[in-house]
Amino acid sequence: MAFTHEKIETKSWLMIALILVVIAFGGLVEIVPLFFQRSTTQAIEGVKPLTVLQLAGRDIYVREGCYNCHSQMIRPLRAETLRYGPYSVAGEFVFDHPFQWGSKRTGPDLHRVGGRYSDEWHRLHLRNPRDLVPESNMPAYPWLEKATVAADAMPAHLRALRRVGVPYSDDEIAGAADAVRGKTELDALIAYLQSLGLARK
């Protein structure tokens, strides 16, 4: 007599047991390999950790709330890729802690803004956006060119990021304060904006 599915379907406890075995096996096949990966997302070619000045700029970007109006994630939609460039992939964000994807766009997406405009354009735009884009509702940030970067805080910041997997070397950490000493917050923010999206064009 051949084995048929009818024997399983008519014995509810056997069917429940077999369902649990299949689910457990499927779960193991999906989950166990992740224990052997250092990271579930690998960096794409060309993605590097931010320099100390860029990292200081990222901190200013977060402090000033830029993420409330600008996203940093291009969705795989034709209209977005035509306007902003290639859609974002997970491997571009492996060194972002926390990532700056955003969920609202009052202003344009900034993920591929690096190299699109000159440093001077950014300087003028951050000083007073309406000088370059008359219809802009972005606030001006004139104080950024007067304030200097908190250089002494940077080594601890790099050490903290290294603890969560960003590959900063001991030399980079030791020289972090000197790398940004005397730089303005405007210089740092521009350096950060110019670094966005360069790994994938």
Predicted regions mapped to residue ranges:
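Post-cleavage N-terminal segment of exported redox proteins
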Residues: 1-50, 164-169, 190-201
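Electron-transfer interface patches adjacent to heme c in soluble/periplasmic c-type cytochromes
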Residues: 15-24, 82-186, 200
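Short, solvent-exposed loop/turn and secondary-structure capping segments
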Residues: 27-34, 71-73, 78-83, 137-138, ...
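Short, well-ordered alpha-helical packing segments
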Residues: 29, 55-58, 111, 123
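Sequence context of c-type cytochrome heme-c attachment sites
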Residues: 34-46, 52-55, 71, 87-93, ...
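Electrostatic cytochrome c docking/interface patches
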Residues: 38-62, 74-81, 106-108, 176-179, ...
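The canonical Cys-X-X-Cys-His
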Residues: 57, 63-72, 189, 193
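Bilobed periplasmic-binding protein/Venus flytrap-like ligand-binding cleft at the lobe interface
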Residues: 61, 125-129, 191-196
